[in-house]
């Protein structure tokens, strides 16, 4: 998992509440267990018309937001069914941070496990971030995870809270496997000691 320290880029404003995981990545893309290639399915029912052509009105199809690294979204983002493909799709598209007032619990947890930072903010702060994001490629937003703050294009800051353990994992690029490997020396020491003390086992 790639480390997450500071992220600077365009933020796309998605002013829709209750965006569920089926909207993020429709069910037809769930057949794969690969984490790559799912960016094409991200919001596919909104990004594409029935004939497969792009919907020019959808935010991520607009020139200013095609390379967005941050998504500013309405309340209750990622609600609905459990599917780890949702953060996979965001990450494969290039989005490493989602900002909202609240998230679906399972989606929220899955984001941390896959290197995507979900940030909860108050509604007033979200409204300010929406205003910043609507300026498109003329304005960039910076996510400073070590200092736990969002910096807008005009220098304004929004502080955010994050669990210290989850912060540690993101900064150091540790997923579940990485966490286990981090303890490898202790595990090896325990196993060597156990073999000596219980040679009969």
Swiss-Prot record:
<comment type="similarity">
    <text>Belongs to the LeuD family. LeuD type 1 subfamily.</text>
</comment>
<dbReference type="InterPro" id="IPR004431">
    <property type="entry name" value="3-IsopropMal_deHydase_ssu"/>
</dbReference>
<dbReference type="InterPro" id="IPR050075">
    <property type="entry name" value="LeuD"/>
</dbReference>
<keyword id="KW-0432">Leucine biosynthesis</keyword>
<protein>
    <recommendedName>
        <fullName>3-isopropylmalate dehydratase small subunit</fullName>
        <ecNumber>4.2.1.33</ecNumber>
    </recommendedName>
</protein>
<dbReference type="GO" id="GO:0003861">
    <property type="term" value="F:3-isopropylmalate dehydratase activity"/>
</dbReference>
<dbReference type="Pfam" id="PF00694">
    <property type="entry name" value="Aconitase_C"/>
</dbReference>
<dbReference type="InterPro" id="IPR015928">
    <property type="entry name" value="Aconitase/3IPM_dehydase_swvl"/>
</dbReference>
<dbReference type="GO" id="GO:0009316">
    <property type="term" value="C:3-isopropylmalate dehydratase complex"/>
</dbReference>
<dbReference type="InterPro" id="IPR033940">
    <property type="entry name" value="IPMI_Swivel"/>
</dbReference>
<comment type="function">
    <text>Catalyzes the isomerization between 2-isopropylmalate and 3-isopropylmalate, via the formation of 2-isopropylmaleate.</text>
</comment>
<keyword id="KW-0028">Amino-acid biosynthesis</keyword>
<dbReference type="GO" id="GO:0009098">
    <property type="term" value="P:L-leucine biosynthetic process"/>
</dbReference>
<comment type="pathway">
    <text>Amino-acid biosynthesis; L-leucine biosynthesis; L-leucine from 3-methyl-2-oxobutanoate: step 2/4.</text>
</comment>
<keyword id="KW-0100">Branched-chain amino acid biosynthesis</keyword>
<comment type="subunit">
    <text>Heterodimer of LeuC and LeuD.</text>
</comment>
<keyword id="KW-0456">Lyase</keyword>
<dbReference type="InterPro" id="IPR000573">
    <property type="entry name" value="AconitaseA/IPMdHydase_ssu_swvl"/>
</dbReference>
């Amino acid at each position: 998992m790639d480390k997450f320290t500071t992220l600077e880029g365009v933020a796309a404003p998605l002013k829709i509440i209750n965006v569920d995981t089926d909207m993020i990545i429709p069910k037809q893309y769930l057949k794969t267990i690969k984490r790559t290639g799912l960016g094409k399915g991200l919001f596919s029912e909104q990004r594409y018309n029935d004939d497969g052509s792009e919907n020019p009105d959808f935010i991520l199809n607009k020139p200013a937001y095609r390379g967005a690294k941050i998504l500013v979204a309405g309340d209750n983002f990622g609600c609905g069914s459990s599917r780890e493909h949702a953060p996979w799709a965001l990450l494969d598209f290039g989005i490493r941070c989602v900002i909202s007032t609240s998230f679906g619990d399972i989606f929220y947890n899955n984001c941390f496990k896959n290197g995507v930072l979900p940030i909860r903010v108050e509604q007033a702060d979200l409204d300010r971030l929406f205003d910043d994001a609507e300026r498109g490629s003329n304005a960039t937003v910076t996510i400073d995870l070590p200092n736990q703050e969002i910096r807008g294009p005009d220098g304004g800051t929004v502080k955010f809270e994050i669990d210290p353990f989850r912060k540690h994992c993101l900064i150091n690029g540790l997923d579940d496997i990485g966490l286990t490997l981090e303890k490898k020396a202790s595990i090896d020491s325990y196993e060597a000691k156990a073999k000596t003390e219980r040679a009969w086992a």
